């Protein structure tokens, strides 16, 4: 199954002391190829930024279907 390994940065939900002080959360997750658009919309809606996207498969050396 084709998967994307995405690294994204989203602002945290909790406000710390002042409104200006924001804390960002970085995370990496595997997203199925078919759900990529939905996940991208979710991150953007939260005010986040996608840092890196890689095509990943479950096992090393597996053909990812790219020519």
Swiss-Prot record:
Entry-linked Pfam families: CpcD
Annotated ranges, domain CpcD-like: 1-56
Family: Belongs to the phycobilisome linker protein family.
GO cellular component: phycobilisome; plasma membrane-derived thylakoid membrane
Membrane-topology annotation of the record: Peripheral membrane protein
Protein's UniProt name: Phycobilisome 7.8 kDa linker polypeptide, allophycocyanin-associated, core
One of the GO BP terms on file: photosynthesis
InterPro entries reported for this sequence: Allophyco_linker, Allophyco_linker_chain, CpcD-like_dom
Organism the protein comes from: Synechocystis sp. (strain PCC 6714) (Aphanocapsa sp. (strain PCC 6714))
Task performed by this protein: Rod linker protein, associated with allophycocyanin. Linker polypeptides determine the state of aggregation and the location of the disk-shaped phycobiliprotein units within the phycobilisome and modulate their spectroscopic properties in order to mediate a directed and optimal energy transfer.
Lineage: Bacteria, Bacillati, Cyanobacteriota, Cyanophyceae, Synechococcales
Keywords in alphabetical order: Antenna complex, Membrane, Photosynthesis, Phycobilisome, Thylakoid
Location in or out of the cell: Cellular thylakoid membrane
């Amino acid at each position: 199954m084709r998967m994307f390994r995405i690294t994204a940065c989203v602002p945290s939900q909790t406000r710390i002391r002042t409104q200006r002080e924001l804390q960002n959360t970085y995370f990496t997750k595997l997203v199925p190829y078919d759900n990529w658009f939905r996940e991208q919309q979710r991150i953007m809606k939260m005010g986040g930024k996608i840092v890196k996207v890689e095509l990943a498969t479950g096992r090393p050396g597996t053909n990812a279907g790219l020519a």
